[in-house]
């Protein structure tokens, strides 16, 4: 009983608070002397004396990581670890991992743990020679690399000793070093009544490493964050691996961190990587370069938009037919693989809309920009290649393809295929059901989903502006009325993205073309509703560092429920509320001029989060094909899969942010005249 009291007085790792003076171990149990007396005090003191003594070395800190990295890199360049070396006594460290890569490919890996790792759980632990651990891990990584390169040399008929030695020396000179120093080993404990999946709320994927022990295996197993990110290992797969190694299976997931089951600890790392020979070694947080500024400025925003647009541009490839282009499917950086080989037509159509929206905004700023014109022409070639998939008459579900392709053709600085645009517009108009909604199949009563109806309505609104045809305006207005009616009671994020798009592009024109005598009043009501929803979305944005996990989530939006206390896990879908806020900011009927500062702040934070999702050379230290990945928006901060939708929706949101800033600047200039 009194031992528990003593342990409570001793805070765990520094992630939970300041540690007391560890030079006098007995002081942390002194409060027990005031609670009990006699033999219980003697018992407590005996327990304390039986615990391993804490060292006198300094506690590991972020500043220690860079010298450690430089030490390892010198050893790697020399191809050997010296026997005689200085010691670096530290407390708080329990282990290290060293990885050697060549152009993103893992060539060698080594780890080293202190023999008393268990004594570092929930406390600083004993003194450790950091250089000693680094030496063991580096030597192991070099041996691993030598074995792998030896096998490769034999396959290439370069196995003769003198040739192999040259191969090794060349590798040592260019090897990219990745060093992780583990600290803050913290127990994960779940109450018996916790939900079966509660364990997923106890660690931030890709930021925390994991260690598991259990009664079925003699040794603990660890997963290090850098390797987790490089392999694109999901949280569930991480736990599955640990369970398998401990003699369990995935069905035993509810046993983790409970009495009698496998025990779990999470830990943090100081992570230093040299991502390329031409870059300095940098500290990374969750494999990412930590952004110091809370917001991004307009120049950084422009650069971010350009990188995403360039990434989408390189997703295209020549088609067999002249003046047409295909689009690659999702890229999986961890496997250096495109799978499936080609994107779905719906994904391609959304990309075309995003790119044309971007090109249109660039053209408005600089009509003579030749690079922008060429980019728009490239998108037009993609549209020509996929036009048949967007036209009616095919068996596949092509409603969204038709709508997004129409929206793409109604933007952009190049001459479009008017006949194709009109055919697509007629196809969308024909989907309208006379009793409301949109038909799934011509001549049948089956209605399309709300989300699809919202996209079709946005497409009709755009066509109403471009064609000046009242039939499209009336159909778009009816679609808006239906969508606002259902969203009043049950708002859906996807609906609001495209409703905002339709209203922002053509709201006043649609109301004017309507036969509804209450159209103006309804339009005001729609804007008031979007104003309210915009505020609610901003309230769901992460604006400060979480209690558990890093601050790379700041700017993202919490769009799904999670267990209390769990680290936030925003995804690329944060681009959707970002687009809604940006569209609302462009309309003074939704966000009044004296209320723009909050939304601008939210947009700046949101753009910062999208920037954190971006794959670059720095956070893509494991990339084997940078050109395929650079500028792509990841699925999440721990899932590097580059789906086309992630980058397309992010480009739409950020382009609307740029347009919102353009509109605010226009208002400022107008007020000065």
Protein language model annotation of sequence segments:
Residues 57-279:
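Basic nucleic-acid-binding interfaces
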Residues 287-298, 349-369, 403-417, 455-468, ...:
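Well-ordered alpha-helical scaffold segments within catalytic/enzyme domains
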Residues 1-32:
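N-terminal secretory signal peptides that target proteins for export/translocation
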Residues 280-347, 422-429, 433, 541-545, ...:
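Low-complexity, Ser/Thr/Pro/Gly-enriched N-terminal "stalk/linker" regions
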Residues 294-312, 365-390, 415-431, 468-486, ...:
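Extended, well-ordered alpha-helical scaffold segments
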